[in-house]
Swiss-Prot record:
Protein name according to UniProt: RHOMBOID-like protein 6, mitochondrial
Family label: Belongs to the peptidase S54 family.
Species whose genome carries this gene: Arabidopsis thaliana (Mouse-ear cress)
Domain of life of the source: Eukaryota
This protein's encoding gene: RBL6
Bilayer disposition of the protein: Multi-pass membrane protein
Amino acid sequence: MRSRDMERGRKHRGDTQWTAWLTPTIVVANVSIFIVVMYTNDCPKTTTGANGDCVAKLLRRFSFQPLRENPFLGPSSSTLEKLGALDWKKVVQGNEKWRLITAMWLHAGIIHLVMNMFDVIIFGIRLEQQFGFIRIGLIYLISGFGGSILSALFLQKSISVGASGALLGLMGAMLSELLTNWTIYKSKLCALLSFLFIIAINLAIGLLPWVDNFAHIGGLLTGFCLGFILLMQPQSGWEEFRNSSQYGARARSKYNPCQYVLFFVAAVLVVAGLTVGLVMLFDGENGNKHCKWCHRLDCYPTSKWSC
């Protein structure tokens, strides 16, 4: 999305712009963790050659697994599992709840990492500059957590990694921020269509094999709700009223009734959704038993691939 499509159309001046340091820190952390993962993986030492040779052998122990094993140019699934990938059996039966958090800091390969971090920079910096690191950090972490819960409920026979849930949470928060702060935007329809298009593209990519679309959906829904809670802004005209020196000027509410309703409904939904999801997960529930067609949301079979 171009920056001009995301610009705020405020009718007053003097908006505070925060310095974005958390988003670059998140990117550095993800890249650093990936380097540690590749060092631990040590393809030349652990690969037997049954699936082919290591890729980029010049990197030695940092070289990638054979493409037949990992087309994203990354480590083996066993290395990811050892270092904190989301694995239903280990989370529920092994009591390793921390995997619901650690999985969002791991990536399947350098392609996966670059794509996610590029989007995190685009969306994260813009949001952090406008709303500060605390609110954006909360949205990122809680959305990633929500994505992990939904993924673990539906994908119980495979492992999952990636910041996609947290990233989609940022996108969802941007969408709800547009809706709840509708009166202070210029080019409302253009911005709305741009958000919906980008989100649709990401969800469509999630229909491909090897991509965890349940993490996408869980993160998106969580972030969408959190946007109504954490990113609510004063309605158009309130700032002018507050700064007005006119005696007897009619009082104006800081937020409009619709914003309060959205705040309350979103708060109930996010608390209830995360609570119910955790209860179902640790009760050993399989989401596919309650939704027979939901597996199609993660991978849609075509003549080009099977699921």
